[in-house]
């Protein structure tokens, strides 16, 4: 767990990696993610990251674990492309930090999560323990969808 930043590293064989570097947007600014999960969404035409971050009007959520964002990653530079960032699951006051990604078909990927009703009364912001399945519908089929 890191209370300051999130990091990324690349390697060719899955065993040996370059030195970790802090996740940033393509303009060089800090991604703002820390202390929680991030997951890859893969498509044959792009690599995407699902994450939480600070700086999204979300100081009301423990460790800024809502909303869930998704953005495309430049795999050569290991940066998140800011212009591609979208909000997948909204901030309703509860934590969304424990989530999963699953390829359902060549045309659809889901990001699933639930509202973690931790202390601090997240219900006052609209949370009620919802379960989410954010559906990503691809314009072009992802022929890699079942090759994990």
Identify the function of each model-found stretch.
Residues 1-32, 44-46, 52-92, 106, ...:
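Beta-rich carbohydrate-recognition and catalytic domains
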Residues 99-112:
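Acidic, serine/threonine- and proline-rich intrinsically disordered appendage/tail regions
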């Amino acid at each position: 767990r890191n209370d300051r930043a999130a990091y990324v590293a690349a390697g060719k064989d899955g065993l040996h990696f370059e030195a970790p570097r802090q996740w940033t947007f393509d303009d060089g600014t800090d991604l703002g993610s820390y202390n929680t999960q991030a997951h890859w969404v893969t498509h044959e035409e792009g690599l995407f990251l699902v994450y939480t971050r600070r700086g999204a009007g979300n100081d009301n959520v423990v460790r800024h674990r809502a909303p869930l964002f998704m953005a495309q990653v430049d795999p050569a530079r290991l940066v998140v492309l800011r212009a591609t960032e979208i909000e997948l699951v909204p901030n309703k006051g509860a934590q969304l930090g424990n989530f999963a990604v699953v390829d359902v078909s060549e045309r659809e990927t889901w990001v699933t999560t639930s509202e973690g009703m931790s202390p601090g009364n997240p219900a006052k912001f609209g949370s009620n323990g919802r379960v989410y399945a954010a559906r990503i519908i691809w314009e072009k089929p992802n022929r890699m969808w079942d090759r994990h």
